[in-house]
From Swiss-Prot:
The active site is at 245 (nucleophile). Specifically methylates the cytosine at position 1407 (m5C1407) of 16S rRNA. NCBIfam families: nop2p (TIGR00446), PRK11933.1 (NF008898). The keyword RNA-binding applies. This is Ribosomal RNA small subunit methyltransferase F. PROSITE patterns: NOL1_NOP2_SUN, SAM_MT_RSMB_NOP. It is found in: Cytoplasm. InterPro entries: Methyltr_RsmF_N (IPR031341), MeTrfase_RsmB-F_NOP2_cat (IPR049560), MeTrfase_RsmB-F_NOP2_dom (IPR001678), Nol1_Nop2_Fmu_2 (IPR027391), Nop2p (IPR011023), RCMT (IPR023267), rRNA_ssu_MeTfrase_F (IPR023545), RsmB/NOL1/NOP2-like_CS (IPR018314). The keyword RNA-binding applies. One of its GO terms (cellular component) is cytoplasm. GO terms for biological process: rRNA base methylation. It catalyses: cytidine(1407) in 16S rRNA + S-adenosyl-L-methionine = 5-methylcytidine(1407) in 16S rRNA + S-adenosyl-L-homocysteine + H(+).
């Protein structure tokens, strides 16, 4: 039990009115006061689900499949000595700690093995859904990950970096700008909207601290502006998923109906009744999923899937972006960089990526990003792969974690003690080995970074945001 969880009487009264079965009110309250089951999602950019399950069994982790996400599991693991977030598997990006309900919006967006070349994640931090979508896109196409809060962009980037993702472009704007700045540019848009967080009670005892009916209405007005912008940015025929981790109809069904009332027949609601077995328990008349915590023993959540059937008016805007600071590498330059990368580390450049240059920095952008360059100011695009020096190229961390395979020949395998040192940002000395230049670092056959030989020592190249200081595996 969570005895500290306080449910305001007006909140309980409002829930009693909207529960699909009013007799479930006691079950709803009891569910809100139960601790939340921990869940994870396997990052298939790094490891297959079958391989991960085998490794989990070796660690005596008990996994229970999440029915709406084939890569998701509830997990029962002994964290008395090492938290899940400090395990080698997590730090190597093999899995993401993600609440089970929050896996549902992305599953809805990619339902039926849908394929998209350009996707917008309008409110992306901390990155659970961005990384989930990148894995389903298999690092192909372009995924614009926007976050309004500048401080949260750092966390978003760290998670993208840890998970070996290379097809993202990060931006830092109010989501309301996209309809005017990038009208009809995306095959799919996910808006996991800022909300009152009523569904998060089980993991946050203070979730209801500032709850009020007045604040819900204010938040709903923001959500309506965001869903309009998301719909405007969507191509005709494209798919929009709107989701929240809250329960009120004002922030959920009524926001979707606002879109329908605004754009009429251009808006089509698509049923999620077949998303997973027993989805009918949460299905609304419109085909949305309105999930209360007692239904599937998870967080409260709402998911709606919407199709755009026709163009709609978009705002006229005046953009002042300034000169784009990157230059596209010539075919000759890209070929030279590709040759040097293969010679140094045995790594091939992906065929769907382009090399761009900024001063001495060498970047790899997703090819599908090029039409958006000059249309929006991005805070970070693709991955930095090298710095050019007189003596050649100095390769960067993400060239290993995003492009190298576990069978990489130009690599060194660390033992457990050395791997702990590595993740704490320290140099390592592999026994009986020495070399020159950069070297791919592996642990348990997973690529965990890039170092540089200095005699018999490997200089640590782990980015600062990924360094841990204690309590490691």
């Amino acid at each position: 039990m969570h005895p500290n969880i306080s449910l305001p009487e007006p909140f309980i009264a409002s829930m009693a009115k909207i529960l699909p079965d009013p007799t479930q009110l006691a079950d709803f309250i009891a569910a809100c006061q139960r601790p939340l089951r921990k869940s994870i999602r396997v990052n298939t950019l790094k490891i297959s689900v079958a391989e991960f399950c085998q490794r989990a069994a070796e660690k005596e982790w008990q996994l229970t499949p999440v029915p709406w996400c084939e890569n998701g599991f509830w997990i029962d693991a002994d964290e008395s000595l090492v938290p899940l977030g400090n395990t080698a598997e997590h730090m190597a990006g093999l899995f993401y700690i993600q609440e089970a309900s929050s896996m549902m919006p992305v599953s809805a967006l990619f339902m039926g093995n849908a394929h998209y070349d350009s996707v917008l994640d309008m409110a992306a931090a901390p990155g659970s859904k961005t990384t989930q979508m990148a894995a389903l896109m298999d690092n192909q196409g372009v995924l614009v990950a926007n976050e309004f809060s500048a401080s949260r962009v750092k966390v978003l980037h760290a998670n993208i970096e840890r998970c070996g993702i290379r097809n993202t472009a990060l931006s830092n704007f109010d989501g309301c700008v996209f309809g005017g700045w990038l009208p009809e540019r995306f095959d799919a848009v996910l808006i996991d909207a800022p909300c009152s967080g009523e569904g998060t009670i089980r993991k946050d005892p203070d979730a209801m601290k500032n709850w009020s009916l007045e604040s819900i209405q204010s938040i709903a007005n923001t959500q309506k502006a965001l869903i309009e912008s998301a719909f405007q940015a969507l191509k005709v025929g494209g798919t929009l998923v709107y989701s929240t981790c809250t329960l009120s109809r004002e922030e959920n069904q009524q926001v979707c109906w606002h879109l329908k009332q605004t754009y009429g027949d251009a808006v089509s609601f698509e049923s999620l009744g077949n998303l997973f077995e027993h989805a009918s328990l949460a299905l609304t008349e419109e085909g949305f999923l309105h999930i209360f915590p007692q239904m599937y023993d998870c967080e409260g959540f709402f998911v709606a899937k919407i199709r755009k059937l026709a163009s709609v008016p978009t705002p006229e805007v005046n953009k002042r972006l300034g000169k784009f600071p990157f230059n596209k590498a010539s075919h000759k330059q890209q070929a030279e960089i590709a040759q040097q990368l293969h010679k140094s580390l045995g790594i091939e450049l992906p065929s769907d990526a382009q090399v761009w240059l900024r001063d001495n920095d060498v970047w790899l952008f997703p090819e599908a990003l090029e039409p958006l360059l000059g249309e929006l100011r991005f805070s970070r695009m693709g991955i930095k792969i090298a710095e050019a020096h007189k003596s050649g190229y100095r390769w960067q961390h993400q060239v290993a974690t995003c492009l190298a395979s576990s069978s990489a020949s130009h690599s060194v395998e660390l033992d457990t003690t050395q791997a702990r040192e590595w993740f704490m940002g320290r140099d390592v000395r592999p026994e009986g080995q020495s070399g020159q230049g950069e070297v791919i670092i592996r642990y348990a056959n997973d690529v965990i970074g890039l170092g540089k030989w200095v005699g018999n020592r490997v200089k640590n190249g782990l980015p600062r945001e990924l360094v841990r200081d204690k309590n490691l595996f």
